[in-house]
């Protein structure tokens, strides 16, 4: 543990005494939370993992700089990182994963160079130098997605659309800037519904199992796709005051047969 880890543990232990739903995020975990909410970040587009004292590639994100370069693959070891085309390499063997990630991530259009030992090479092999230009990376494999599940009942086949919603995400920064096509779960689910309508499904299942929560406003807006108007959620403060959050958009995007799935790991729904 470093000092930030210890401070985070202490503050969260203290906060839970008064409110089990209050959490403190260290700078590193706050950055992770922001990525989880916005489903986008600036970097090379690779998931990393700790393998004893080495940092290895766990997966490559489709469309990112690492994916486009075709120079990295799962299992490769990163042993050095350098900033720009002229920066000196830092030996990162034995580093914490958080510290390695902080060196590899960076602003869009900036250059990072990596010393990489390919997965099929021995650890004492001469490393390859991989030059990557950082870019905006969309975490598309954690977006809301849909599938069609057919089943038979009374000698009739039904096609049911299943929309999987992993979290209530939104890119707050783009939304506040007025970016026209900012990313949000409500927009993605709306596109899923449009696709399922085109395919003439007989009903829709909203799968919220293991949904960890996210933006309360997105949960309200998402509910608004299925109702005309009205109350969606109540918020009770410590002084007993109750606030009712409503959906005011009268447009109903889907009014057919609907089923919602959740489990004990479902939040904000």
Residue ranges and their predicted role:
Residues 1-43:
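Extended, domain-scale alpha-helical bundle/helix-rich regions
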Residues 25-41, 50, 56-61, 65-68, ...:
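Cleft-lining beta-strand/loop regions that shape enzyme active-site pockets
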Residues 75:
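Conserved catalytic motifs of ABC-family nucleotide-binding domains
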């Amino acid at each position: 543990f470093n000092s930030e880890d210890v401070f985070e543990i202490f503050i969260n232990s203290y906060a839970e005494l008064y409110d089990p739903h209050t959490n403190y995020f260290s700078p590193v975990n706050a950055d992770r939370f922001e990525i989880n909410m916005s489903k986008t970040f600036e970097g090379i587009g690779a998931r990393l993992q700790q393998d004893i004292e080495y940092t290895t590639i766990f997966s490559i994100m489709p469309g990112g700089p690492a994916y486009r370069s075709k120079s990295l693959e799962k299992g490769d070891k990163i042993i050095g990182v350098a900033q720009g085309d002229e920066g000196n390499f830092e030996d990162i063997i034995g580093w914490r994963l958080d510290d390695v990630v902080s060196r590899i991530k960076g602003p869009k259009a900036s250059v990072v160079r990596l010393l990489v030992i390919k997965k099929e090479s021995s650890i004492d092999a001469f490393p390859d130098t991989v030059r990557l230009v950082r870019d905006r990376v969309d975490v598309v494999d954690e977006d809301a997605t849909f599938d069609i599940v057919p089943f038979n009942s009374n000698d009739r086949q039904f096609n049911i659309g299943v929309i999987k919603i992993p979290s209530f995400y939104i890119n707050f920064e783009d939304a506040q800037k007025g970016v026209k096509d900012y990313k949000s779960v409500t927009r993605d689910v709306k596109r899923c519904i449009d696709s399922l309508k085109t395919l003439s499904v007989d009903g829709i299942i909203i799968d919220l199992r293991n949904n960890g929560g996210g933006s309360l406003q997105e949960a309200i807006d998402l509910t608004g796709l299925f109702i005309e108007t009205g109350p969606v959620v109540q918020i009770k403060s410590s002084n007993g005051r109750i606030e009712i959050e409503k959906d005011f958009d009268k447009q109903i995007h889907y009014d057919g047969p609907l089923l919602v799935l959740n489990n004990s790991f479902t939040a904000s729904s």
